[in-house]
Amino acid sequence: MKNRDVNRMTKALGLRRKIIGVRFLYFKHEYDKLSVEEYGRKTSYCMMVKHAMEDNCFKAKLENFRCRCALEALGLDEEMECVESGQRYYSLNLYESRAVAKDVTKDISRIKQKIYGVQLGPLEQLEDADVAIFMVNAYQLMRVVQGYTYKWGIPKNLYMAGNQGVCADLTAGPFEKNDMNFSVLCAGTRKMCAWEDDEMGVGLPIQQFEPLTEGIIQTMNYIDYPTQKDQISERLDDPMELGVAVDKNVHYGKLGKPYVRPSVYEQLKNGELE
């Protein structure tokens, strides 16, 4: 089912990069027993995420992390005391006062329990992923939000500060809050990973992936216009690959007209419409 949904979401949205999974490895013996290649270098966590999106599956532990903030966000090391006080962020001259810096720090997600390592790779290759992450442009993000609201209503756990865009916004946050989040990323990951200017990220707990995919597809025919539907059709190997056929003859703009025209609505209320 996971492989099918990865394919369906990728083709429905036209994603440029692979959807990846992140699995948290709590114990050393669990990490050692996992028979996937070790990352073998020391970089930022967001560079690991991009490496996974390039069709690589691997595991990494504390020694592979160059970014202190990611280590703490993902639970691989304890926070320094300067974190909760806001001193770390205030020292960067990104916030007007220590109070603002402390408030921002408080709301940046961090996994509280100790974690030994992580496994990353294309989602279809991870048996027990905890979080799914993928990159989108603005139109694709609109469709993700529409798919989410189809299933769960308006997202109520969205948060970002323009910092720690991958480690906190897309990984720790969805896991800790048990809900989808999206992020405009941060300057650090945009520089190191060379994301395109129009790219943003989506992270969600793994159990939301299948229903989110379904929500995106169930709203496709009613929201996407013929131009987008043509592009979707071109990506498909089979007309029923998404589970529903692409239909250029329907659109939500053609529906519900009695509910936007007062005079027609009166007829509806009075039983005068067939």
Give residue spans per PLM region.
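Acidic, serine/proline-rich low-complexity intrinsically disordered regions
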Residues: 3-274
